[in-house]
Amino acid sequence: LVGSEMCIRDRSCAPDARGVLRFCLNDKPILLNGLLDQGYWPEGLYTPPSDAAVERELSEVKALGYNLLRKHAKIEPQRWYYHCDKLGLVVWQDMVNGGSKYNLWFVTYLTNVLQPLMRRLPDKAPLWGLLSRSSESSREEYRRELEDTVQALRCHPCVGCWVPFNEGWGQYDAAGAVQTIRTLDDTRLVDEASGWYDQGGGDVYSLHNYFYPLRVRPQTRTVALSEYGGIAWPMPGH
């Protein structure tokens, strides 16, 4: 016997009764409450010990009340996405970071402290060196990996949003990356630049807030607090 499965779903952004843009699943507003998931395992670093361990971890995420995982800096095996499909977990899929050695003062320290000033910095050719993408071969490698990633994972209904860049790590021409994604898959949302160096495109106004009180103004894109923190929970004996 040969079996198969299918899923019909629609993801969008639409205004609520007050005119505030909300994430929607099948035309109904949904509060996305999730975790930043880098896919580490104590037994094998980036390699899970078993398929059962993957399923158990994802089931625990669901049991804890989360409905979203932002898969950060890693592409998982297909079975990981299969389990997310089955469990009804939404995945925001980051592209794997690349480029040359990062200028941490530019992409981490200054942007955290001077967010309002730095967010609108353009990611065009004059800044590619500061953003660690001065090499044409590096930019071509990113374009190839972007296309391969979308083509490999677009069959999974759990994938709800593509995230081409995170915090300026190897970022360049984010608008072009969004256009490439739209050409390959126009059924998902796109978070053009998670954190900073926002170019005004995609579907998400994506904020990383580690130090300041959160103040959100109405936007033409749906607002997401896609990272926050500096929060620790000390565990005795850990």
State where each predicted segment sits.
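Active-site mouth loops of central-metabolism enzymes
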Residues: 40-53, 132-139
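Catalytic domains of carbohydrate-active enzymes, especially glycoside hydrolases
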Residues: 53-72, 77
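Short, acidic/polar
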Residues: 47-60, 142-149
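Short, isolated positions in well-ordered beta-strands
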Residues: 30-31
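Acidic/histidine-rich helix-loop elements
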Residues: 37-48, 109, 113-116
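Low-complexity, Pro/Ser/Thr- and charge-rich linker/hinge segments at domain boundaries
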Residues: 9-25
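Short, small-residue-biased leader/transition segments that mark boundaries at the very start
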Residues: 1-8
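Substrate-binding/catalytic cleft of secreted carbohydrate-active enzymes
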Residues: 68-238
